[in-house]
Amino acid sequence: MRILVTGATGYIGSAVVGELAAAGHEVTGLVRDEEKARRLAALGAQGAVGNLREPGSYRDLAAGQDALIHTAFEPSAEGVQADRTAIGTLLAAALAGRVRTLVYTSGIWVLGTTGDTPTFEDATTEHPAAIVAWRPAHEKMVLVAESSQLATAVVRPGVVYGGRGGLIGSYFRSAEKHGAAEYIGNGRNRLPMIHVEDLARFYRAVVEQRGRGIFHAVDGNAVQLADVAQAASEAAGQGGAVRSIPVAEARAKMGPVVDALILDQVIASRRNLEIGWRPLHENFLGEADRAYAEWKAASA
């Protein structure tokens, strides 16, 4: 298939590009400049320079694809509008061209705190974390565009680890810098997680199977934040030393994202087997040493 990936050099996007190219697909990554376009060659993909805020820079390219995967996002007010513009542009291109599948990247924060009962794809998004309060409307834009010709899917990844690290890299970084992995609050909140390689395979499965609707990309393990920090500390050679940062102190430094980072979530999926996917990586606690080695290699 001919597949366009936005955010193609990002943490998730680059993994998706590499997975799709390795599987024999003709992948084009939408990037912001020529330097990033050149990076994609190492992943077996082509680069195309465009700006999500400028529909004319990628609309025709998108219309000529078999599938579109939107992973790009800029965490800012302008980024929210750019995301909405991108969705509208990609959908219009899909309807005007040959596109058969469109996949949108959301996240589990739209579900808010879930409590102890596993939360599946049909759960409400009425109480999302405030920082992503806009996102359920963007999910709906994608989902209502589904038709017999166009399969639309929303992927909600858990906390991603592996490779260059994502959020988990901050625990490795603080362990190295301060001698203890720092986390926010009491650490009893649970994190649904997924290795970046498993997530890339997940996207490939959704595209190849023309998945429709909402999918939770999680490995089935809800791990307490304090345990994640301790495992990161041990992997970083700090003997499991951790330090809790009070929520109020973290909010003063980091803003509203803190309330998303301390969500207590138990997320599950009833749909992964529909697309023939299961995680190959055990879980973060069992793979912290490997994840740290990957992070160090990517940071070198």
Task: Report residues per predicted region.
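Mid/C-terminal beta-alpha module of Rossmann-like enzyme folds, strongest
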Residues: 2, 15, 200-257, 296-299
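C-terminal amphipathic/interface module of NAD(P)-dependent oxidoreductases
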Residues: 50, 258-300
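N-terminal Rossmann NAD(P)H-binding glycine-rich loop of SDR-like oxidoreductase domains
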Residues: 3-25
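Conserved beta-loop-beta element that borders a ligand/cofactor-binding pocket
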Residues: 139-163
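NAD(P)-cofactor binding segment of oxidoreductase domains
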Residues: 61-104, 108, 113
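Active-site "gating" loop of Rossmann-like NAD(P)-dependent oxidoreductase/epimerase domains
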Residues: 108-132, 147-148
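Glycine/proline-rich active-site loop of Rossmann-fold NAD(P)-dependent oxidoreductases
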Residues: 136, 160-172, 177, 205-215, ...
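A conserved pocket-lining segment of Rossmann-fold NAD(P)-dependent short-chain dehydrogenase/reductase
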Residues: 173-194
